């Protein structure tokens, strides 16, 4: 069977023309109109937060949400965010109603960007009526940004990874 690949879409009149002999890979599909982009980006922020924002809110002592670690017990013992509730994804249907307040938003996390456990846990929680967000980067980025964490052997802390976080506590990434 002979299949032919279709050519990449050409920029439309609403996108700037590419320079040179080839069309822009970035602008092959033009950017969304501003109102559409704003709606999509607002919707993304309604579903996601990041480790720095979670850490800042937890530091207040009254974050207004419950943080849920959706990983296995072995992963939890290896390290978890202080103050998180351990609720493995597979246990959400049976235990969420007993462990979580349905009036309080829930933020889920798993290992890191390559794991969809937090997404699956958030879906299961949303299907039970909980308001949910995922913590982007998961536990991996919590550690890489230098935030303290707990293990089965006690508290730990790692130096921030310069590729993911400012090296000095006084610095702010500007996000």
For each of these PLM feature ranges, what is it?
Residues 95, 144-145, 161-162:
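Short Asp/Glu-rich motifs
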Residues 97-143:
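Catalytic cysteine-centered active loop of the rhodanese-like fold, especially the PTP/DSP P-loop
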């Amino acid at each position: 069977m002979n299949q032919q690949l279709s050519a990449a879409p050409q920029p439309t009149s609403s996108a700037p023309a590419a320079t040179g002999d080839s069309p822009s890979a970035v602008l092959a599909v033009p950017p969304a109109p501003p109102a559409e982009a704003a709606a999509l980006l607002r919707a993304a922020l309604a579903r996601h937060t990041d480790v720095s924002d979670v850490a800042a809110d937890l530091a207040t002592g009254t974050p207004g949400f419950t943080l849920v670690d959706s990983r296995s017990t072995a992963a939890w013992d290896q390290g978890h965010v202080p103050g998180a509730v351990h609720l493995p994804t597979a246990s959400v249907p049976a235990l969420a109603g007993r462990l979580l307040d349905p009036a309080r938003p829930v933020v889920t996390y798993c290992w890191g960007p390559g794991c969809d456990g937090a997404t699956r846990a958030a879906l299961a929680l949303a299907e039970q009526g909980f308001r949910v967000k995922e913590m982007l980067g998961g536990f991996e980025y919590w550690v890489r940004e230098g935030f303290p964490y707990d293990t089965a052997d006690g508290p730990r802390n790692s130096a921030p990874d310069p590729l993911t976080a400012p090296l000095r506590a006084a610095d702010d990434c500007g996000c």
